[in-house]
A protein has these predicted regions:
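Mid-protein regulatory/catalytic core that forms ligand/cofactor-binding pockets
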Residues: 16, 22-132
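Conserved segment of winged-helix/HTH DNA-binding domains
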Residues: 1-11
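Short, charged, intrinsically disordered terminal tails
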Residues: 128-143
Length: 143
């Protein structure tokens, strides 16, 4: 996976440039970029990149709000779904990136507002943020 910090770019800028580059580049050029990055298997948002033969890795994850019960559930952020630019900027500033280990501290009855703690950040995610983060249960998540 290519983390946004490897290029020292925020998600919002990375997304805009990646879309433009992909749309305007030849397959050969894109293959060379992938090779120079050691053939990443996931994009910066944690989404699987198809193999040359078209295979896409399946994931066992769920939206964060679907994992919000029980309280204190340890989770590992696996990916960020497509989201509006404002949501990506909000998340980028708070660091809940793929492979981040976190704990769900509290949530509303509808699981749409979730309080999360990780080593890098703790705070509240409103529906826009909680709805685009995907995670899996993890027994070694941050306290």
């Amino acid at each position: 996976m290519l983390p946004p910090r490897r290029l020292d770019l925020p998600w919002s800028e990375l997304a805009a440039n990646a879309d433009a580059l992909e749309a305007s580049s030849s397959p050969r050029f894109l293959q060379r970029i992938e090779a120079s990055l050691d053939q990443p298997t996931h994009d910066p948002y944690g989404q699987p990149i198809p193999t040359p033969d078209g295979h896409i890795e399946s994931r066992r994850d769920a939206r964060l709000r679907e994992l919000a019960r029980p309280r204190w559930a340890p989770v590992r952020i696996t990916r960020v779904a497509d989201a509006p630019l404002e949501t990506l900027v909000f998340l980028d500033e708070r660091h809940p990136r793929p492979d981040t280990r976190s704990r769900i501290q509290a949530c509303t009855a509808e699981n749409d507002i979730i309080k999360v703690r990780s080593a890098e950040w703790h705070g509240t995610l409103l529906p826009a943020g909680a709805g685009v983060l995907h995670a899996s249960l993890h027994d070694e998540a941050a306290r």
